[in-house]
Each structure stands twice: as structure tokens, then as C-alpha cells.
């Protein structure tokens, strides 16, 4: 008999094992007291079974081994030991815990993988989202896999926002939870599998698997498809008894074998770094304190100006008097659809007015937040405003000459650069939850501190431990580690408050705060916490010489106050608000399902169809979630015609001409091999050359098989099998390859395009990104990692190196690759290459002519033009997520780098700027930035994929060229597999508003060169 303890980030588990049988089990949450609870359970077990060996494991347990006189073992061997004891037939194990995930391959020399950079896809994410969806704990085991909604689980906090938004838009909570289960499975397959697929039998362990049958269903669905693709016979995927206790069982078995104690490595587990708490002037501290909640209604209030912030996590309402003073505020977590939440806030106002003895008279109503359009349509708002602009208006009302507004909310961060009252640039969080306020509330609860007392505890701390910046869930693990190291709750809360500004500026913004100005206004609910406000002010004063930092008097209400002020200033006649009685009667019906998905292009946007009726409102039907105007119509009978305000889109023009089918050659052979080519990565630069070359070499165009444009479905179908995870486009490439190998093709053509032929000169080289050049080989590695899938399907792989900058070398490379395959000689090969090169030249000439026409028309109309600074593969609508289409739909003409005319005058020569540059994409972006700098009608829209190393290297050069221009700009530098619709809409609408204001001042002013 032996005793096993598993002390993890949230629970302590204890088992007593006799032989291979579990005779006793306990699982308790430790609530921030892991050592005390582990000691209590260990002491009790030793009292009952004296002299029995004790093993211990878990993220916290190993560090407690010496103090508890237990034998430590790491979680992975502990789980493997228990599995071999309980289920020796198992080949693969997937374990999900509260904050970690593991994949064990027991049939392959014991390989194991764990999540390393992010805790998305673990139990903590599931628990939090289930609570937000209003699903009771006893409901979760009854949920089954159904529907076809999609949720991105790359970050747990943003997965939560996706899920809540889907429910708000009419999706059934159970169906959304099923979508979350699918997303978590795909996330773990991608992060843990790295191209390897678990072989059957597969054992599912951990608390989430033990309690949620829908997860097991999702694993069976995903693995069944993966096994079918690879020709692997299907097998069992099951959850065993004691699924949550296998690590503890393994620890007990480890101890029973008389295992030695692990040596302690000095220096590795030293006390975490901490600094003495800063000494703050009480008066300076008091100046950062937010005001108490307003409750100033009285009989004297005749007319109120209302602002509603229909946020994804919180619904807020403020009432201003004619002088702009806040007389009433109401806010609560968002629970139903935005209209129902707004109605609840209005009822709270009506009750407060009635208690005060006054009469409710509403002069104006404004709406902002993600639900603003719906609230405005249902209630008759006078103004609907994007939330960035609302925050800027509220900030200017407090600090008229503010430079930067820093809004930290529960699940998002916004930083706005304000110049002469206009938002010139901004940064919003999209792909990671680091730096958000919701985690602080969670940490306070977990530490037993009421959120209202957070600041008092943190400001009283003697020490401030240093937390690393990054994932909020991993920071929670660090919180538990610090508790174990002897830091008290107040010190830990102080450390978290100090980490927040570093997360905002280092992780979300990615730039020094000095680039954003000197006068900062802090807003958002997180800054109502005085400890957070003080830490943020300290950070800014350390980073920016002479920084002036203030906190909005009502930081949690900034958006609502701003839109109320906007409505007050914009409404000069009767309000459009239909009245409280009408608000009570209005009804909103929303539907989000696979039936509402847009089918008008391959992207397949997940739309919601919303109908508003009753309460004197004109019946309306709204379409939400569409990325372009083609998806704005409810029925499929609508054609793809552009709306009247649709501007030219150079990126779409470029892509349409890239993939024009070449004419059939007179030498075309009906028996030529069917060649599959992925429509991804380097093909977005070289398609005319390669397609026309192959056609001229004798391949009929109908035997050139291109994968379709990227869609969410195609990505999820293929990306889970990647062998690496550097960036979204590289993962996407494998999805295109997997689509092709399922087609009846003979050859899979994956050229390694090492260099690009570009107009820019004066750099050391024009090499492709190494990931672009190598993506074909990494795709082949993935296809061969679990057996040779290409050989099984009878497909020949062709992955030649092609040097586009050297025609002579390229000619030899193409002959080596296709000479025998197509039966062509040197002469035919040379002529085919000449045809391909001519097609590439025509493509560039067509694009330049299109750009010239757009610029001439813009000058004639006095309008600005957005120039997309992006890599060629961002032309894929699934990679750029429809950014160019949405800009064009907002009447902003769009040019790509390829359609921007290459005007001479020295701009193409980068020898004085980037003489040592080697990357072609970086060189093209720099040239385009110089062109933008010269022409005041051109506005920069920078697109970059999340974690793009090549773009990071040129970021400072682009900033130096663009940041001092007094023009609107848009940075979408974190494009990834998920498209956070709320954040995208906010950024695009903010930019569009700034462009309209800029054009009003631009007029027909003559061009001037910016020195």
C-alpha cells in the first residue's frame, strides 16, 4: 500500500493505492493554500496507514517533497507509470488540467509534449467560459457535440469573448459550448501534436475529460478524421475511471517502488525576485483616485443626456446634465443580448429618478460598444459611435490637451494617440489577454480578498514581487508559486498591479510609451483600482521624462460618457429615442447558426441575422458578422455587386490577376500529369510566372489544380497537423497542402522560392522569408511524420529550389524539376520560361496602371488612399481577414504595394536606409513607406502576422518613416488564425472616421513633399 499526492495549480488530490487498485481518493481546491492542505491530507493518510511510502507530484507538489518527507516525481512519468499499470494497452494519452495540457506517446519511446507558451485549451478556460454562458455545473455533462459554430481557442480570454458574443447574437449556449470543445481539441492537437497524431487506443485524462463527455466526443471526431486521412485503423478513445487522479496514482506507485528522492538543484528554485514597495506621496496618490459612483439625481434634473456602452462583458449607462456632469450611472455584467442589457440599465435610471421625485426626460441618447448598432436600431439612438472615439471624447473633456488615452478594461486594452483632438493612431489587444483587468479580479478572489479591498491590501505591501509579462493564466500559476515562497496576499496583489502596465506597453502596444506622447490619461475599469493606477503612473513616469499622468474621474464609464457627450453635441432637434415604454416593448430576435453562415465567397463569415420589431420601432433586419457588403444581404439571391460607396480595392485587383488561368498551349498534352499547387505563401508573388510556364511547357490549364482561397473551415481541417508553430501563414500552408493531397493529383508542386525579383534596389539581398522558402519542406515533413502519406496516395512530391532573381539559374532549376516529368527539352523549357516571365511582367504593368488610375481619381475627388503595407501572401482573404475589403466598403480606396506605381526619383533606392537588408518583403514595405511619406494623400495600413520575425526587424525603420506624419494610420500587426470581430470592427471604424476627418481638411490642397 502507498500514498500519492498531486498538488497542482488549483487542487490537491490524494489517493491510497494497494497493488494497482485505488482504495481511497480525495480531491479538494486549495484556494491559495496548497502546502497547508497537502500537509493536512498527508498527515491524515500517515495516521491511518503508518509507515507507508508517500509519493508526490504536480506543478507545486515536487517543491513540497522535502518538507513533507515525500518522494517526488514529475507529472509526465507519474502519469505514464499509472497508465501502464491501469491500461497497458494504451498507445497515447491526452491529459487536460487546470492550467496545463500533456500529450504522451507511449508507443514511441515515451515521447511527451506539454503546453509551453499559453494556457489556452485547458480546464481554466472551460470553467470560466461555462460560467459566462450561464451553464450550471450539472448541465455540462449533458451537453453533446452538435452544430457547426466555430470558436478560436488560441487565447482563453478571447475564446470567452467569442463565445459570449455568439450567445448574444442568438446562438444556443449548449451549441456554443460544443464549439468550444471542438476548438480546445484542435488547439491541443496543433500545440501538442506538432504533426503527430495520437494513435489508438487513446486515453483521455484530467478533470475536464472526467466531467465533460462533449470533450471526448470532440476528440473522437477530430482523431477519426485524422486517422482516416493517414490510413490508420480507428480505435477506442475513452475516459477511464479515476481519470482526474492518474498523476496521484503514479506518484503512489513511484513511492511503492522505493524510488530515490530527487536531488535539489541549487539556484533554480531561489526565492523569486522582489523589490521594496515604492514610497508614494499621499497627495499624489489621492490625485489618482477615481471619484465615488455618482448618485446626484434630484427634482431639478429636467433633461438628461444618456450614453450606453453595450460592451461584450459589461453594460453601462450614464446620464449627464446639460453641463456634462455625471448625474447617474448604472453598470452590470452583460447577460442577455445588448438590447435587453440596455433596457435593464434604463429601468435602473427610471427607478432612480422616481425615488428622487423627479420626472424622467431624455434629451439625447448615444450608443457605443460592440452592441451599439443593435441598441441604436432598437431604441432610436441619436448617435452610434465606435468606442475608441467615445473614449477620446471623454478624455478630452477631462484633459483637453491629452496625448495618449490608455483604456484597460476587463478583457481588452486600447491605447489611443490623440493629436489636435483627433485619434491619429491606436493599439488594441486582439490575440492575447495579457494586461487585462479581469485577471486582477480573479486573483483577488483566489487570494480571499474582496475586489473592493484590492488596493488597500496592495498599497500596504512591504514587498512587490516581479511577475513575468505574458499569459494571464500562467501568471496565475506564478501567483500560487509566490504564495508557496512566503509572499502574502497583499504583496502578490501589488506585484500583479505592477505587472499590468508592463503587459500593456511591452506585450500589447509593443512600443515605448514615449512614442505616444507626454500627457497620459488612464481610463477603464482596471484604473478604478488605485493600486493599478499608481503602478501605471509610476511606470509611465519612469519611462517618459516629464510625463503628466492623470486618471479619469469615472474611469469605468469613459465610453458611455464620451458617447453621451457626442450625442449632446450632435443633436439639435428632438431626440430619436422612442421613450421608455417603447424600449420596454421592443423585441429583438437573433439567430447564429450554420444556416446563417455567408456562402458568397470561400471565407464563409459566421453571420448573425437579427430582427428588431415592436415598441414603435420600424421593423428592421440586421446582418452582423459579415466582413464585406456582399454578406450584408440576408438572402442568397443577392449578387456580388458592389455597393454605391464601394471604393477600388487594389489588393483584390492584384489577387484576381495573380491567379488568372493561363491559355492552353498548342503543345498541351492530354496525358500530362495533374499538378497540385497550394494557393499560399510564395505563390502570391510568383503565380503568373509559374502557371504560364507550366501551361507553355505542355500542361493543360485544367490539369493545374490550385487549392481554393483560405477559409476558416479549410484551416481547421488541416492546420492541426503542423510540425512547427512560427506564424499563421505557415500553419495555413499545410491546410492547402492537405486539401490538395485529397484530390486526384499526380504531382504535388512545392517550390522553395528562395529569392524574390523586386523593383527595389540598394539592399544586400532580396531573399524570401526563410519560413516562406522552407514551407514546402516542412509540409512534406508533416505528411511523412506519421507514415508517408504521399506514397500511400501515389503522389510524387516536387520541391525544387527556384531563384527568381537569376533567369539563367532559374532556367536550369526548372529543367531539372520538369524536364523528365513533362518530357521537355532545353529549348521548350527556355521558351516556356520566357512565356512565364512575360506573364509576370504583364501582371506588374496591369497592377501599376490600376494604381495610377486610382491615384488620379483620388486627386480629382480630393480623397485619401489607404496603402496596404503587407507581404504578398496577405492578399489571401483568409490571411488578411478582409481588411482591404472592409476599407473599400467604407469608401476608402485601397492600394497594395504591387499596385502602388513605382515612381522614380530615388525612392526605390534604399542604399541610404537599409543597405544591409536581406529580406524582400521588408525592402518593399520600406519603399512603400517612403512613397507614403512623400504624398499627403497616402495613408499607411500596416498588416503583419502575429509573431512575424521578419517584420519585427524592420519595425523601427517603418516607424521612423511614418510616425511623425500628421495623418491617420492603421496597424493590424497581429493577424492570426482567429478574427476577433469586435476588435476588428473597432479598429476599422476608428480609422475610417479619422480618414473622413482628414479628407475634410485635405480638400484640393496641393501636394507637398515632406522632407
Language-model features and meaning:
Residues 31, 108-148, 155, 244, ...:
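Glycine-rich phosphate-binding loop plus the immediately following alpha-helix
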Residues 161-192, 477-506:
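Adenine-nucleotide phosphate-binding core of ATP-dependent small-molecule kinases
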Residues 60-61, 193-223, 240-244, 368-372, ...:
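Glycine-rich phosphate-binding loops at beta-strand->alpha-helix junctions
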Residues 115, 119-125, 230, 432-440, ...:
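An N-terminal assembly and electron-transfer interface module characteristic of large anaerobic redox
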Residues 179-200, 286-294, 348, 352, ...:
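Phosphate/ATP-binding catalytic cores across multiple sugar-kinase/actin-like superfamilies
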Residues 2-43, 111-112, 116, 308-347, ...:
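Short glycine-rich, Thr/Ser-proximal phosphate-binding strand/loop in the N-terminal lobe
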Residues 123-131, 238-274, 393, 437-442, ...:
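Glycine-rich phosphate-binding/hydrolytic loop that grips phosphoryl groups
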Residues 72-76, 220-249, 382-389, 537-561, ...:
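Conserved phosphate-binding/catalytic loops in two-lobed NTP-binding clefts
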Amino acid at each position: 500500500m502507498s500514498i500519492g499526492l498531486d498538488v497542482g495549480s488549483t487542487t490537491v488530490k490524494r489517493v491510497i493505492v494497494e497493488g494497482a487498485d485505488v482504495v481511497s481518493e480525495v480531491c479538494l481546491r486549495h484556494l491559495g493554500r496548497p502546502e497547508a492542505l497537502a500537509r493536512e491530507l498527508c498527515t491524515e493518510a500517515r495516521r491511518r496507514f503508518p509507515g507507508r511510502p508517500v509519493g508526490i507530484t504536480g506543478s507545486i507538489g515536487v517543491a513540497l517533497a522535502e518538507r513533507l518527507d515525500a518522494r517526488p516525481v514529475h507529472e509526465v512519468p507519474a502519469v505514464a507509470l499509472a497508465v501502464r499499470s491501469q491500461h497497458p494497452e494504451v498507445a497515447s494519452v491526452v491529459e487536460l488540467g487546470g492550467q496545463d495540457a500533456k500529450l504522451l506517446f507511449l508507443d514511441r519511446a515515451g515521447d511527451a509534449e506539454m503546453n509551453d507558451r499559453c494556457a489556452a485549451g485547458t480546464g481554466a478556460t472551460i470553467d470560466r467560459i461555462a460560467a459566462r454562458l450561464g451553464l450550471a455545473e450539472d448541465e455540462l455533462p449533458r451537453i453533446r457535440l452538435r452544430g457547426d459554430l466555430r470558436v478560436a481557442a488560441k487565447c482563453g480570454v478571447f475564446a470567452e469573448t467569442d463565445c459570449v458574443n455568439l450567445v448574444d447574437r442568438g446562438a444556443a449556449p449548449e451549441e456554443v459550448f460544443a464549439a468550444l470543445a471542438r476548438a480546445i481539441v484542435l488547439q491541443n492537437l496543433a500545440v501538442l501534436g506538432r504533426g503527430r497524431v495520437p494513435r489508438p487506443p487513446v486515453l483521455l485524462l484530467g478533470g475536464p475529460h472526467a466531467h465533460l463527455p462533449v470533450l471526448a466526443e470532440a476528440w473522437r471526431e477530430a482523431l477519426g478524421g485524422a486517422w482516416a486521412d493517414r490510413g490508420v485503423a480507428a480505435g477506442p478513445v475513452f475516459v477511464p475511471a479515476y481519470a482526474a487522479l492518474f498523476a496521484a496514482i503514479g506518484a503512489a506507485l513511484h513511492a511503492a517502488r522505493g524510488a530515490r528522492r530527487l536531488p535539489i538543484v541549487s539556484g533554480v528554485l531561489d526565492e523569486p525576485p522582489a523589490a521594496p514597495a515604492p514610497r508614494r506621496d499621499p497627495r499624489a496618490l489621492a490625485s489618482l483616485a477615481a471619484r465615488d459612483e455618482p448618485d446626484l439625481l434630484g427634482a431639478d434634473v429636467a433633461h438628461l443626456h444618456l450614453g450606453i456602452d453595450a460592451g461584450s462583458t459589461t453594460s453601462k449607462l450614464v446620464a449627464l446634465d446639460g453641463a456634462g456632469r455625471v448625474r447617474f450611472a448604472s453598470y452590470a455584467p452583460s447577460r442577455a443580448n445588448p438590447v435587453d442589457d440596455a433596457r435593464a440599465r434604463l429601468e435602473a435610471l427610471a427607478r432612480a429618478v422616481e425615488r428622487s421625485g423627479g420626472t424622467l426626460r431624455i434629451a439625447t441618447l448615444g450608443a457605443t460598444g460592440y452592441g451599439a448598432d443593435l441598441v441604436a436600431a432598437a431604441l432610436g439612438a441619436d448617435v452610434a459611435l465606435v468606442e475608441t472615439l467615445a473614449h477620446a471624447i471623454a478624455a478630452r473633456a477631462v484633459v483637453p490637451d491629452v496625448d495618449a488615452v490608455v483604456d484597460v478594461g476587463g478583457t481588452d486594452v486600447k491605447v489611443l494617440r490623440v493629436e489636435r483632438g483627433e485619434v491619429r493612431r491606436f493599439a488594441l489587444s486582439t490575440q492575447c489577454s495579457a494586461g487585462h483587468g479581469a485577471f486582477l479580479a480573479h486573483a483577488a478572489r483566489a487570494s480571499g480578498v474582496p475586489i473592493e479591498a484590492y488596493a488597500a491590501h496592495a498599497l500596504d505591501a512591504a514587498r512587490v514581487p516581479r511577475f513575468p509579462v505574458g499569459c494571464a493564466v500562467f501568471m496565475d500559476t506564478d501567483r500560487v508559486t509566490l504564495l508557496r515562497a512566503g509572499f502574502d496576499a497583499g504583496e502578490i496583489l501589488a506585484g500583479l498591479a505592477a505587472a499590468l502596465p508592463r503587459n500593456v506597453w511591452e506585450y500589447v502596444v509593443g512600443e515605448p510609451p514615449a512614442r505616444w506622447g507626454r500627457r497620459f490619461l488612464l481610463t477603464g475599469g482596471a484604473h478604478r483600482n488605485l493600486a493599478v493606477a499608481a503602478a501605471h503612473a509610476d511606470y509611465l513616469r519612469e519611462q517618459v521624462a516629464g510625463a503628466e499622468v492623470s486618471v479619469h474621474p469615472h474611469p469605468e464609464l469613459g465610453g458611455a460618457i464620451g458617447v453621451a457627450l457626442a450625442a449632446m453635441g450632435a443633436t439639435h432637434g428632438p431626440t430619436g429615442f422612442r421613450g421608455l415604454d417603447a424600449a420596454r416593448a421592443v423585441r429583438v430576435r437573433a439567430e447564429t447558426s450554420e444556416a446563417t453562415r455567408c456562402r458568397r465567397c470561400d471565407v464563409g463569415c459566421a453571420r448573425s441575422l437579427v430582427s428588431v420589431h415592436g415598441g414603435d420601432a420600424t421593423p428592421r433586419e440586421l446582418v452582423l458578422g459579415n466582413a464585406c457588403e456582399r454578406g450584408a444581404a440576408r438572402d442568397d439571391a443577392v449578387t456580388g455587386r458592389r455597393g454605391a460607396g464601394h471604393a477600388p480595392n487594389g489588393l483584390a485587383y492584384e489577387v484576381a490577376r495573380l491567379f488568372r488561368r493561363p491559355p492552353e498551349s498548342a503543345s498541351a498534352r492530354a496525358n500530362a500529369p495533374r499538378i497540385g499547387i497550394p494557393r499560399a505563401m510564395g505563390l502570391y508573388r510568383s503565380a503568373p510566372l509559374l502557371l504560364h510556364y507550366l501551361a507553355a511547357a505542355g500542361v493543360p490549364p485544367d490539369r493545374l489544380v490550385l487549392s481554393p482561397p483560405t477559409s476558416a473551415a479549410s484551416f481547421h481541417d488541416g492546420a492541426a497537423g503542423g510540425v512547427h508553430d512560427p506564424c499563421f501563414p505557415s500553419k495555413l500552408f499545410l491546410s492547402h497542402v492537405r486539401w490538395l493531397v485529397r484530390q486526384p493529383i499526380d504531382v504535388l508542386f512545392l517550390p522553395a522560392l528562395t529569392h524574390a525579383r523586386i523593383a527595389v534596389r540598394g539592399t544586400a539581398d532580396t531573399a524570401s522569408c526563410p519560413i516562406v522558402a522552407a514551407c514546402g519542406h516542412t509540409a512534406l515533413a508533416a505528411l511523412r511524420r506519421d507514415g508517408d502519406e504521399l506514397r500511400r496516395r501515389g503522389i510524387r512530391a516536387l520541391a525544387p529550389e527556384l531563384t527568381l532573381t537569376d533567369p539563367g539559374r532559374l532556367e536550369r532549376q526548372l529543367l531539372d524539376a520538369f524536364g523528365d516529368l513533362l518530357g521537355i527539352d532545353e529549348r521548350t523549357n527556355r521558351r516556356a520560361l520566357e512565356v512565364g516571365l512575360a506573364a509576370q511582367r504583364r501582371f506588374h504593368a496591369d497592377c501599376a496602371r490600376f494604381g495610377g488610375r486610382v491615384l488620379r481619381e483620388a486627386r480629382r475627388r480630393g480623397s485619401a488612399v489607404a496603402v496596404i503595407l503587407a507581404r504578398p501572401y496577405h492578399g489571401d482573404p483568409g490571411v488578411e481577414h478582409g481588411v482591404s475589403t472592409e476599407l473599400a466598403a467604407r469608401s476608402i480606396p485601397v492600394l497594395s504595394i504591387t499596385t502602388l506605381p513605382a515612381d522614380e526619383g530615388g525612392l526605390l533606392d534604399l542604399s541610404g536606409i537599409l543597405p544591409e537588408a536581406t529580406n524582400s518583403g521588408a525592402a518593399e514595405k520600406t519603399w512603400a513607406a517612403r512613397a507614403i511619406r512623400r504624398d499627403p494623400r497616402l495613408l499607411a495600413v500596416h498588416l503583419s502576422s502575429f509573431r512575424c520575425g521578419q517584420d519585427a526587424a524592420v519595425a523601427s525603420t517603418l516607424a521612423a518613416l511614418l510616425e511623425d506624419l500628421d495623418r491617420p494610420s492603421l496597424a493590424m500587426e497581429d493577424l492570426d488564425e482567429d478574427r476577433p470581430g469586435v476588435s476588428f470592427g473597432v479598429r476599422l471604424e476608428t480609422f475610417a472616421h479619422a480618414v473622413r476627418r482628414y479628407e475634410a481638411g485635405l480638400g484640393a490642397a496641393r501636394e507637398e513633399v515632406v522632407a
